[in-house]
Amino acid sequence: MSYQELDPIVWSAIQQESARQNRTIELIASENFTSQAVRAAQGSVLTNKYAEGYPYKRYYGGTEYVDVVEQVAIDRLKELFGAEYANVQPHSGSQANAAAYMAFLKPGDKILGMSLDAGGHLTHGAKVSFSGKVYESHTYGLNSETETLDYEAIAKQAREVKPQMIVAGASAYSRIIEFDKFRAIADEVGAYLMVDMAHIAGLVAAGLHPNPVGIADVVTSTTHKTLRGPRGGVILSQEKYAKQLNSAIFPGSQGGPLEHIIAGKAIAFGEALQPKFKDYAQQVIKNAQAMAKVFNDTEDIRVVAGGTDNHLFNLDLTKTALNGKQTQELLDTVSITTNKEALPNEQLSPFVTSGIRIGTAAITTRGFDEDDATNVAELIVTAIHHYDDEKVLKQVKREAEALAMTHLFE
């Protein structure tokens, strides 16, 4: 019996999702498109195999082939970032972060990470997250004038808080992060330094953003986003921390690893080691900067921090007629996918927000160049300025879908 016949409901939903992905313009900064090889690995027979433990040190038999796959993933990841140690088993970035905390901290220890409205992630100390419940969390923000990291202010706060760990990295910050300055702050107050490079990992791998490996005590990341791999997480560190980090993943926070996902990671890391991956990463940044220019040239839409050095940026919509939620929903109707985003010192609910986040990793994978990116930004501006004009919005949707369909993904 075919897949379609066996479960027509699920089959139909997947087909519709495939069509949606092809006809829409994906601008959510945390999303990307994997290669067919990565997708094939995730659907392979490796999903049938349980393999608690680590390569060549398993608790189950029959692991000789998954050992090969996982070791390849480890070796490629270490080569990609110049790391002494790598763990490819975390199921997600959040679980990688949880394990990193567990390896270095005790419950109740203090952590200092970026606040949500400044661009940080839930797992960097937000009170609704385990990171803000298990640990005493404190957060730093941005300079109110430049909307960028103020390292002197962070250092002052670190001296006052005296955290056991400082967390650098963000999910919505468009400028270069100077990890060496965070290292100096951590050293001054006797703290561990953890870097979450989930969003910028692909840019780091391509040499287009400073590499935190070798600077931070521990580095975590997702494997999707700018790395274009399957959804999952990784941990990088020094060999001296290998035992405690391995134990924090298994048996500390996970059981059997997802070897079919690890196979996808191995393939994605191999792809990122190829010279053409740097070309891709360079185009990601060029596209983001081209889009940011369009918005900055308007009178009522502003790019937070003035621009971008990476794959994303946030738009301040406070001078328009729409909030973040309304803009996200509006753009959904014209086949452009974004997400609402809190701005520095946000006054609205996180379910509403005053801005949206834009990312170019996914459209660049589909072959969009600066001209295409500029076109997309202009369509967004038109939609926002004519949010109540059905005729204009229908035309924007036609143009967006036509552009998307000229760049089909694999």
Swiss-Prot record:
> What cofactor is needed?
pyridoxal 5'-phosphate
Cross-referenced Pfam families: SHMT
For this protein, the Enzyme Commission number is 2.1.2.1
Compartments where located: Cytoplasm
Q: Which UniProt keywords are listed?
A: Amino-acid biosynthesis, Cytoplasm, One-carbon metabolism, Pyridoxal phosphate, Transferase
User: Which domain of life does this protein belong to?
Assistant: Bacteria
Q: Where does (6S)-5,6,7,8-tetrahydrofolate bind?
A: L116, G120, H121, L122, S349, P350, F351
The entry lists its GO molecular-function terms as: glycine hydroxymethyltransferase activity; pyridoxal phosphate binding
- Per its UniProt record, what InterPro entries does this chain match? PyrdxlP-dep_Trfase, PyrdxlP-dep_Trfase_major, PyrdxlP-dep_Trfase_small, Ser_HO-MeTrfase, Ser_HO-MeTrfase-like, Ser_HO-MeTrfase_PLP_BS, SHMT-like_dom
**Biological process, per Gene Ontology:** glycine biosynthetic process from serine; tetrahydrofolate interconversion
Which reactions fall under this protein's catalytic activity? (6R)-5,10-methylene-5,6,7,8-tetrahydrofolate + glycine + H2O = (6S)-5,6,7,8-tetrahydrofolate + L-serine
State the SUPFAM superfamilies in the record: PLP-dependent transferases
Locate the site labelled Plays an important role in substrate specificity. Answer: H224
Q: In which pathway does it act?
A: One-carbon metabolism; tetrahydrofolate interconversion; Amino-acid biosynthesis; glycine biosynthesis; glycine from L-serine: step 1/1
* N6-(pyridoxal phosphate)lysine PTM sites in chain numbering: K225
Any single GO CC term annotated in Swiss-Prot or TrEMBL for this entry: cytosol
The entry's family comment says:
Belongs to the SHMT family.
Functional summary from the UniProt entry: Catalyzes the reversible interconversion of serine and glycine with tetrahydrofolate (THF) serving as the one-carbon carrier. This reaction serves as the major source of one-carbon groups required for the biosynthesis of purines, thymidylate, methionine, and other important biomolecules. Also exhibits THF-independent aldolase activity toward beta-hydroxyamino acids, producing glycine and aldehydes, via a retro-aldol mechanism.
Q: Which PANTHER family match?
A: SERINE HYDROXYMETHYLTRANSFERASE, SERINE HYDROXYMETHYLTRANSFERASE 1
Quaternary structure annotation from Swiss-Prot or TrEMBL: Homodimer.
Annotated protein name in UniProt: Serine hydroxymethyltransferase
Q: Which organism is it from?
A: Leuconostoc mesenteroides subsp. mesenteroides (strain ATCC 8293 / DSM 20343 / BCRC 11652 / CCM 1803 / JCM 6124 / NCDO 523 / NBRC 100496 / NCIMB 8023 / NCTC 12954 / NRRL B-1118 / 37Y)
